[in-house]
Design a protein with these regions (language model features):
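Short helix-capping and inter-helix turn/linker motifs at the boundaries of alpha-helical repeat units
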Residues: 1, 91-93
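Short coil/turn linker motifs that delimit alpha-helical repeat modules in TPR/alpha-solenoid proteins
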Residues: 38, 89-90
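Conserved amphipathic alpha-helical segments that form helical-bundle/coiled-coil interaction surfaces
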Residues: 2-80, 97-100, 112-123
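Conserved, function-critical positions that sit in or immediately flank catalytic
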Residues: 104
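Helix-centric, low-specificity signal for extended rod-like, repetitive segments
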Residues: 90-91, 111
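Short arginine-rich
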Residues: 122-130
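Extended hydrophobic/aromatic segments used for targeting, binding, or gating
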Residues: 80-84, 88
Length: 130
């Protein structure tokens, strides 16, 4: 999965390039995802969380890659897989992982942000494609 290669690097780049406002926005998206009781609301804020990390890189190529990911995420087939495999417990797990990612970005821990994102994506992939 290409996302597993690129997105941890985006998290690492966000450590170096994110402003305080970027970090606040990422944290807000995480908080909003965590507050959702339905999959649609969670999916929206989960997408925002990841989009804001890409945006915080200040890298046009990475931001363009995220736009492609967003189109894929909104396709019917992807949504069907999400609905079948993303349980409440799994959403809670993803939110815990998001908290670790944003904490590492806020603390300017490049290796921590990269590894936390990698672990999160492995968890997502194994959860959706068991």
């Amino acid at each position: 999965n290409v996302r597993l290669i690129i997105e941890p690097q985006a998290a690492a780049a966000a450590v170096s390039n994110a402003t305080g406002a970027d970090i606040d926005a990422i944290r807000h998206a995480h908080d909003m995802a965590q507050a959702q009781d339905d999959l649609d609301g969670f999916e929206y804020w989960d997408g925002e969380f990841h989009r804001l990390i890409y945006s915080a890189t200040r890298n046009e190529l990475l931001m363009s890659f995220e736009e492609v990911l967003d189109v894929i995420r909104k396709r019917t087939q992807w949504l069907r897989i999400q609905r079948a495999h993303v349980t409440v417990a799994r959403r809670q797990q993803y939110c815990r992982q998001h908290a670790e990612i944003v904490s590492n970005i806020a603390n300017r821990n490049t290796n921590g942000a990269e590894e936390a994102m990698r672990q999160h994506l492995v968890s997502v992939l194994t959860g959706m494609f068991p």
